[in-house]
Amino acid sequence: MMAQSNMFTVADVLSQDELRKKLYQTFKDRGILDTLKTQLRNQLIHELMHPVLSGELQPRSISVEGSSLLIGASNSLVADHLQRCGYEYSLSVFFPESGLAKEKVFTMQDLLQLIKINPTSSLYKSLVSGSDKENQKGFLMHFLKELAEYHQAKESCNMETQTSSTFNRDSLAEKLQLIDDQFADAYPQRIKFESLEIKLNEYKREIEEQLRAEMCQKLKFFKDTEIAKIKMEAKKKYEKELTMFQNDFEKACQAKSEALVLREKSTLERIHKHQEIETKEIYAQRQLLLKDMDLLRGREAELKQRVEAFELNQKLQEEKHKSITEALRRQEQNIKSFEETYDRKLKNELLKYQLELKDDYIIRTNRLIEDERKNKEKAVHLQEELIAINSKKEELNQSVNRVKELELELESVKAQSLAITKQNHMLNEKVKEMSDYSLLKEEKLELLAQNKLLKQQLEESRNENLRLLNRLAQPAPELAVFQKELRKAEKAIVVEHEEFESCRQALHKQLQDEIEHSAQLKAQILGYKASVKSLTTQVADLKLQLKQTQTALENEVYCNPKQSVIDRSVNGLINGNVVPCNGEISGDFLNNPFKQENVLARMVASRITNYPTAWVEGSSPDSDLEFVANTKARVKELQQEAERLEKAFRSYHRRVIKNSAKSPLAAKSPPSLHLLEAFKNITSSSPERHIFGEDRVVSEQPQVGTLEERNDVVEALTGSAASRLRGGTSSRRLSSTPLPKAKRSLESEMYLEGLGRSHIASPSPCPDRMPLPSPTESRHSLSIPPVSSPPEQKVGLYRRQTELQDKSEFSDVDKLAFKDNEEFESSFESAGNMPRQLEMGGLSPAGDMSHVDAAAAAVPLSYQHPSVDQKQIEEQKEEEKIREQQVKERRQREERRQSNLQEVLERERRELEKLYQERKMIEESLKIKIKKELEMENELEMSNQEIKDKSAHSENPLEKYMKIIQQEQDQESADKSSKKMVQEGSLVDTLQSSDKVESLTGFSHEELDDSW
């Protein structure tokens, strides 16, 4: 603490300049100053380059000639030179300024390959060997050195020496002969039998091989250049085609927008008319409501009296409730007091328990400290014993050395004893010779005594040697015990080491497998994400297409609200007959071509309205292959229908020609514009797509005044329609291949626009021949059966049902999607119930069609007979009533459709939830695997620690127990944190999924609001 306070005081005393100088001096002393400068310069350059990269500033454009490869090679040469020479500052500035990265620096082999130096050449080898040997010099220095040596070797020679002596010759011929002789001597002598032709053939072969190699190289170069040219031309062609396609698409979009604007204007006018009618109805309802208000006021007076009585009863009940609530409050207060007492008790118990745990912890820690102290004392004692054993070993070594010395002394004593015995023999001989026996005996006795002493000393030394040898042979018991323990410990360590290596290898394999598996799972997750994104984009596109089709169909329904009267003829068309059955054809039907034209126009339009269902069928995510198959089947069906229509049109044309001669009224009818419009809409589905022009031709045709001219126009128009039908069928036969999605959507929109224009191009009567009718009459006369009338919708729905039955081979998901589409389209089907109600009301559905023919013929004959106008007014009233019923039914159908759409959205939500659940499962499995890997690593660390503890012979069960408890606590904390992470990830995923579902639901509601 004192040192820290001193440091703070010193820092407070120092000024900024002094601190700066001190820092500078410390950096300079440590040798960090240069590196800091280079780092700061590098960072400054990067910061200055950053606004250039973001687009704020424009860098100076330096005109550099040559390719980027050569620039990179030269930059890498300079960088290598700066690095080898140790110019760190200039290198740190050069890297960011040149835009060169450390990973992108060319190697020496790359540079040599770029300079096109042959790897087999001596220059290449010398450069490579020189770079390996001379690490200090760079590639640039070595290369320049080699170039200098190469040019020095090729210097011109000023002095020459002549080795061969030339003799003076007089003539030039002799000199040439001498040169030929020298060449003949120098040239190697070949076999005499070898001819000149063989040599020439060899030269020819060599030259041909060289020419072939050169030709092959030239051909390769020519092929590469030609292929590049072809690719460039193909790119230019594709770009031109793209621009053409974009221009056509823009024109089509402009035409569509204009048509939509016209439709919007017409719908606004109808809405204004509808609002005026509604205001009148509201006024009548208001008067009725005023009468009802008077009645209600009387009832209110009665109700007030009842309410007063009820209020009195209610006050009594409130007083009872108040008393009950007061009792409940008292009970709640008592319960709160009980809870507070219990909470206090719990807190006290928890405090006691915590104190006990702390005491236990302190006791355990004290025990552990004592155990550690005892272990240390034992270790000190063991060390002392080891020191004593070592000292005993040293004593043993000393005793062994002493035994060896004693053995040497014994050998010397033996030699002395032998010498003494010899001396004794010599002395005995002398004694025999000499006469002094007494002196000799005394000397003998002394020598014997000395011998005995020496023998005793020898025996004692031998005994000591034996005892010492026994002690050396038998080691100490403590040493034996320690040796046994050491052997056991070494064996255990070897076994544990082998087990550890096996476990480590197995865990390493598991880790690699898990890593590979996790990589695969990540790739699958990325694939799932990409598929989900693509599916969401497809769903959004398909919803937009659905919205457009709904708006178009509803606009057509609003444009032409009148129902068709001829129900039996359309039922015959639904069953597959082009012309009504023979039993249902009456004389009026045959004599009135206007009715026949209406029937054929409806039949053609009903066949056309089948096509936009491709959008609805393509609403499933995996519907590309199905759509291809459906389009092929649809093309075949359209070809068959085109053939049937050709036959039907021919038969109809013959009947019209026959009936025109019989009935004079048929000539007065207006031209068959409905039929022509229907046929033109059919021909508009050909690949040329001449929709707009043909519709305009129909809408802008001048009406002819005379009857003969009208008949000619009818015949000409019907003939042109038949020829166009043939052209459309032929083009359809050719275009059997399926179109892409963009073309499908465009074609379906073009169909809808063509149908809408056919309604706009309805005929108006000629002012010269016929009088102008009343507004109600004109409405009825102009409300000829439209393209999207209910019987034709029945035809479309019947065909869709048959197609769905044919498509039963597909998956259940697609079946559900098709069912939803059928339910969505069934809202339009019930619009065809009005003709059936009319039949039930007054028309006979049996064989004679006279009433139906009369009702249909009333449209053109209304200009001549005033009695028919009254019938039309009555029919109008009936139709208005039926319209009101239809509005109610439509509302019910809209509710059903909304419920169906909600079901579809719920299914989509379920699918999204399934996808998110799968994603969560994958993430959880990955997290579990990561946990397992962490646990395995912890186990490895534990095993290492245990081995270390065993090797140190200081195992303590309490320490192990405490370590295990700490590890368990760490694992629990890690598990809790991972669980929290998983929960947060799941919450984020659920929020994302809910947002996506809400966006989908919002999109669907917006679609519904826009559609109505």
Swiss-Prot record:
InterPro entries: LisH, OFD1. Residues 609-665 are annotated as: Mediates homooligomerization. It is linked to Orofaciodigital syndrome 1: A form of orofaciodigital syndrome, a group of heterogeneous disorders characterized by abnormalities in the oral cavity, face, and digits and associated phenotypic abnormalities that lead to the delineation of various subtypes. OFD1 is X-linked dominant syndrome, lethal in males. Craniofacial findings consist of facial asymmetry, hypertelorism, median cleft, or pseudocleft of the upper lip, hypoplasia of the alae nasi, oral clefts and abnormal frenulea, tongue anomalies (clefting, cysts, hamartoma), and anomalous dentition involving missing or extra teeth. Simpson-Golabi-Behmel syndrome 2: A severe variant of Simpson-Golabi-Behmel syndrome, a condition characterized by pre- and postnatal overgrowth (gigantism), facial dysmorphism and a variety of inconstant visceral and skeletal malformations. One of its GO terms (biological process) is cilium assembly. Homooligomer. Interacts with LCA5. Interacts with RUVBL1; the interaction is direct and may mediate interaction with the NuA4 histone acetyltransferase complex. Interacts with SDCCAG8; the interaction is direct. Interacts with MAP1LC3B. Interacts with C2CD3; OFD1 may act as a negative regulator of C2CD3. Forms a complex with KIAA0753/OFIP and CEP20/FOR20; the interaction with CEP20 is detected only in the presence of KIAA0753. Interacts with PCM1; this interaction may be mediated by KIAA0753/OFIP. Interacts with TBC1D31; regulates OFD1 activity in cilium assembly. One of its GO terms (molecular function) is gamma-tubulin binding. Keywords: Cell projection, Ciliopathy, Cilium, Cilium biogenesis/degradation, Coiled coil, Cytoplasm, Cytoskeleton, Disease variant, Joubert syndrome, Nucleus, Phosphoprotein, Retinitis pigmentosa, Ubl conjugation. The modification Phosphoserine is found at residues 663, 669, 686, 720, 735, 745, 774, 789, 811. Residues 720-737 have a biased composition (Low complexity). Its main location: cytoplasm. Component of the centrioles controlling mother and daughter centrioles length. Recruits to the centriole IFT88 and centriole distal appendage-specific proteins including CEP164. Involved in the biogenesis of the cilium, a centriole-associated function. The cilium is a cell surface projection found in many vertebrate cells required to transduce signals important for development and tissue homeostasis. Plays an important role in development by regulating Wnt signaling and the specification of the left-right axis. This is Centriole and centriolar satellite protein OFD1. Residues 615-1012 are annotated as: Mediates the interaction with SDCCAG8. Residues 189-557, 622-662, 867-956 form a coiled coil. Belongs to the OFD1 family. One of its GO terms (cellular component) is nucleus. Widely expressed. Expressed in 9 and 14 weeks old embryos in metanephric mesenchyme, oral mucosa, lung, heart, nasal and cranial cartilage, and brain. Expressed in metanephros, brain, tongue, and limb. PANTHER family: OFD1 CENTRIOLE AND CENTRIOLAR SATELLITE PROTEIN, ORAL-FACIAL-DIGITAL SYNDROME 1 PROTEIN HOMOLOG. Residues 764-774 have a biased composition (Pro residues).
